[in-house]
Amino acid sequence: LLHARADGADVRMVYSVSDALELARANPERQVVFFGIGFETTTPPTALGILEAQRSGLDNFSVFCNHVLTPAAMKAILNVAADAGEGETLEVDGFSGPSHVSVIMGSDAYRFCARQYHKPVVIAGFEPLDVLQAILMLVRQLNQGRTDIENQYTRAVTPEGNRKAQAAVAEVFELRPSFEWRGLGAIPRSALGIADAY
């Protein structure tokens, strides 16, 4: 994008998809493309922006979608660890689950770690004491030989997550067959694309 801007393209940093929608409304003669990136936390606002653009007939607004999925990346890492050959080392003892991502997904989304890979997950909040407590909880699980999904961030994360946000994402997006991750390579079913209806 910096190169495009240097070549004369009108590239603007916006705080949110709402800002991009406002740019499209204010400039009906110009095509406004929102670069939708990020994990589960940033995906629902993009979905709502797409729905708003469709509802309001905003034909000069589009999204370049690069929303990715945390569980798929975790599975890819765990699969690499499981397939490590002699002389290769990639040991994963457990995960500290990301807080805001988990608010959307819910703690149940990590069950595969315990069931399929026998790895514990502790969802941590943002505050220093949250992080320390989550690390302690994870170390206790490891010391006790447990592989549970625990939620340190109970003040914000529920088992089911944010159902309204999940519904908006399910309506607007669909799984891509594969996505190329920087540093990880292609990971199957690890990103979202915009459904044909949008």
Which residues does each predicted region cover?
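The feature marks the mature, well-folded catalytic cores of soluble enzymes
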Residues: 1-27
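Active-site histidine-anchored catalytic micro-motif
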Residues: 26-36, 41-98
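A conserved active-site cap/scaffold subdomain adjacent to cofactor or substrate pockets
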Residues: 84-159
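Short gly/pro/ser/thr-enriched loop/turn and capping motifs at secondary-structure boundaries
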Residues: 20, 40-43, 69-73, 102-104, ...
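Short, solvent-exposed amphipathic alpha-helical segments in soluble enzyme
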Residues: 2-4, 48-55, 78-82, 110-116, ...
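Glycine-rich, charged/polar anion/phosphate-binding loops
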Residues: 20, 71-77, 107-110, 168
